[in-house]
Each structure stands twice: as structure tokens, then as C-alpha cells.
Amino acid sequence: MISYLKGIVAGIQNVGSNRVILTLEVNGMGYDLQIPQRLAKQLPTTGDLVQIFTHYQVREEIPLLYGFSSPAERDLFRHLLSVSGVGAASAIALLDTLELPDLVQAIIAANVQILIQAPGVGKKIAERVCLELKAKLIEWRKSAGFFVATEGPAPGILEEVQMTLFALGYTAHEVSHALHVVSEDIGLPKDAYVEDWIKQAIAHLSSSEQVSH
């Protein structure tokens, strides 16, 4: 089994919706690896040396290589593939939607509303991911070195806050990060009013947008 490849970036191309292929030249041979869009944005320009952690899969007798930025990202991809009904496309979509620690926390907390923001991931699949992986990821994230995220809003409040922020056009990653900041840095109680969570989250998101500009 190929654990990782270290080589020169020969090219990156989008070959379809949410499908990115990295061509990596290793010792004179070119390897095509499907990678998350998030990784594609992080990679250096063509000609630079990189290390990519890999997952090898044979589908319909066709060998496929998937590439990831870290062993933890690859391991989480494998955990997702172990869930009934989850294929590589859905697993990569989930990895692209949230940062690794946020995705792990969303699964452990059974935060279906966040998970269904990933393209091609419906409510039933999201619920199955939470059901089948929660116990595994509670243990796995310790060995992976992920922080234990704060709870954020209480479950009854969380869904309403998320749906409001999604309706305003914010992404799952932006919403997850904003709620973490509001809970951790501002110290808003998890049972505070919905309006307070929304107000504080929008304030943080607006300030972040101003900084980026």
C-alpha cells in the first residue's frame, strides 16, 4: 500500500463538479490523485516539491489514488468511507465543507444541519455518519491531537441560529468558526437567546469580512 508520495507538482485540474486532479511527478513517473479542493488551494505552484498522503482504492476494477494534506485528513476520509452509503465524492465534499476539527466535532455532536451543507450529502446520509462514527471519532480525535471544541448554543437553539446564518449566505465553515469564537472568546452562555447568538455571530463575521478587505 502507498502511504504517501513526495514529488513535484506537475499540474492541477478541475475535471468536474467538486473533482480536482493533482498530477504529481515522482522519480520520473506521473501519478494522478484526486484531492479535496481545500488542498488544491493550499498547494504551491507547479514545479515545487510536496508530500501528499494517499489512499488507494479499486472501484469497478479501476485503481484510484486519493491525496490528502495530512495523515489525519486521510484517516478521517477512511472513516467516512466506512459508513454505509458514503462514497468518495461525499467524503471529499464533507472534508471540503469544514476544517478537520470542526467536521469531527459536528459528527460527534450529531450536527446534521452543518453536515448537509456539503454538496451531495442529504439528511439521511448525515444522520448515518453521526450514528456510525460518533463513538469512533471520540477516541480517534484524541490520538489525532484535535482540540475539544466548546459546545456552542444549546441543541434547540443551534439549529435556528445556523439556519438563519445559512440563509444570510454564510458558509458552514464560517458559521462553525463564528459560533466557536462567540462561545469561547466572548463567553456567551449556551442557553442565551437565539437573537443574542445571531447578533454576536454576525458581528464577528462582519468584522472578519472588513479585515479581509
Curated annotation (Swiss-Prot):
Transmembrane helix keyword on record: no
Presence of the UniProt keyword DNA-binding in the record: yes
Name this protein carries in UniProt: Holliday junction branch migration complex subunit RuvA
Family named by the database record: Belongs to the RuvA family.
SUPFAM superfamilies associated with the record: DNA helicase RuvA subunit, C-terminal domain, Nucleic acid-binding proteins, RuvA domain 2-like
GO biological process, one term: DNA recombination
InterPro entries according to UniProt: DNA_helicase_Holl-junc_RuvA_I (IPR013849), NA-bd_OB-fold (IPR012340), RuvA (IPR000085), RuvA_2-like (IPR010994), RuvA_C (IPR011114), RuvA_C_sf (IPR036267)
Region (Domain III): 158-213
Single annotated GO MF: four-way junction DNA binding
Lineage: Bacteria, Bacillati, Cyanobacteriota, Cyanophyceae, Nostocales
Main function: The RuvA-RuvB-RuvC complex processes Holliday junction (HJ) DNA during genetic recombination and DNA repair, while the RuvA-RuvB complex plays an important role in the rescue of blocked DNA replication forks via replication fork reversal (RFR). RuvA specifically binds to HJ cruciform DNA, conferring on it an open structure. The RuvB hexamer acts as an ATP-dependent pump, pulling dsDNA into and through the RuvAB complex. HJ branch migration allows RuvC to scan DNA until it finds its consensus sequence, where it cleaves and resolves the cruciform DNA.
Major subcellular site: cytoplasm
Assembly description: Homotetramer. Forms an RuvA(8)-RuvB(12)-Holliday junction (HJ) complex. HJ DNA is sandwiched between 2 RuvA tetramers; dsDNA enters through RuvA and exits via RuvB. An RuvB hexamer assembles on each DNA strand where it exits the tetramer. Each RuvB hexamer is contacted by two RuvA subunits (via domain III) on 2 adjacent RuvB subunits; this complex drives branch migration. In the full resolvosome a probable DNA-RuvA(4)-RuvB(12)-RuvC(2) complex forms which resolves the HJ.
Organism: Nostoc sp. (strain PCC 7120 / SAG 25.82 / UTEX 2576)
Domain of life: Bacteria
UniProt cross-references to CDD domains, sorted A to Z: UBA_RuvA_C
Gene name of this polypeptide: ruvA
Region: Domain II, residue numbers: 70-148
Region (Flexible linker): 149-158
Compartments where located: Cytoplasm
